[in-house]
């Protein structure tokens, strides 16, 4: 298609089909909670409105009402005075303005052929004023609902991150290898998960988790008669209704989606022991970050049973595993029987990109470091005009380098098991970048130490060490039942092989701990004081490159 009007119609048809899925064939019976959550159900106060306005993110495109967040944030108190009556009326009548139920879909390209619609993600541009009310609802509900969610879920939750899940999985793989125990990992991928969730089931889930009826009716009203228009080139498509999924771009969407994922995994693991032994009484069944699920089991049959249960439970909510992207990793396994989703055999892999980081069957991070260097090099080369510019100051160039190149390079470095060889590769790349920014030729007699001083940089291994121990301090401050914190001391039931144990991330951390004259217990007490931890460990011991 070459004509813009034809392309616009095609995009509208694609998103119309995507956002209006058929209902699940077998709707689940989900009981209501015995009591509603104890949260404030009164109409929004001016203090809440001001707080929500201040929390709006700047730089976001305006929705159909053409009101950018900056216009509200310019004077939060005045904006709150204007909105107070409107939001109070909405709260009492439980009806959203029709304009708030319309959104514009902006297409963002993903991997793959950009000539195919399926390789784009749609993000909804919504009313900034509507997001003020959504934020108030979210702040009231989030804490109470969060306390009921499974500990394995780290997505969209306070004090949790991708790094926590990546580190936990790496430790599980490394310890399984060291203790010679079998481990099966199934990386589940869903097809268009946020767009496929059945809404009739979603409202049942909100009652199941005890959300008060006032909130449910207001949220449901914002989804009823919801319409979208697709932005393409310089035009807008015709309006169409949306009946499935949560609004991508809405503040409430991740919160609502977590209810669905939590129910699926609770039903999947209910009265089952198909995970790995985590402590004397509990098994670890999976690690989750929103819809990115890594099932773990100690034998093939357990993994097959759990995969089948997850598939059946997710289909009841309108979600379907993507069999072409769902992969299985086997560590220390002699059983060659495949794991299936329905009748489709899942591909077995020796490495997998989990939450943006490459996790390998040997537990190492060499492959991930190689990928990080390549991605950072691409990012650096894309900014070549910045580095060669005579207008941009050197200070600004280094700020751009840190935020756009080094951030890519060091993503997940907290979990890396670095070696002398990988450290040299990382440092060589950084040195190459610094020399290009500073316009220092290799023929110039400038040592690496002089280069780092000119750039205000530390050696890369020191930077990685600081990031690692800063993150470890955060983990040691979490509750004792935190899964990542427990992983720091977890050992599977098995027997080590004869000979010297291989190096691992955790063994390296424990070695550093002993060299500093500490134990996990003393580090745990030290970490409770953030200032002392930052001064003595992150900026003290790590800077000494111990």
Predicted feature descriptions by range:
Residues 59-67, 105, 115-125, 163-207:
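Conserved catalytic palm subdomain of right-hand nucleotidyl-transferase polymerases, strongest
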Residues 63, 102-105, 121, 153-155, ...:
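Catalytic palm active-site di-aspartate
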Residues 77, 118-149, 167, 243-273:
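Conserved pre-motif C helix in the palm subdomain of viral-like polymerases
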Residues 132, 344-417, 461, 467, ...:
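Basic, alpha-helical interaction scaffolds
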Residues 190-290, 298-300, 326-330:
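Conserved polymerase palm-domain catalytic core
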Residues 234, 321-350, 450-460:
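Short, conserved micro-motifs composed of acidic
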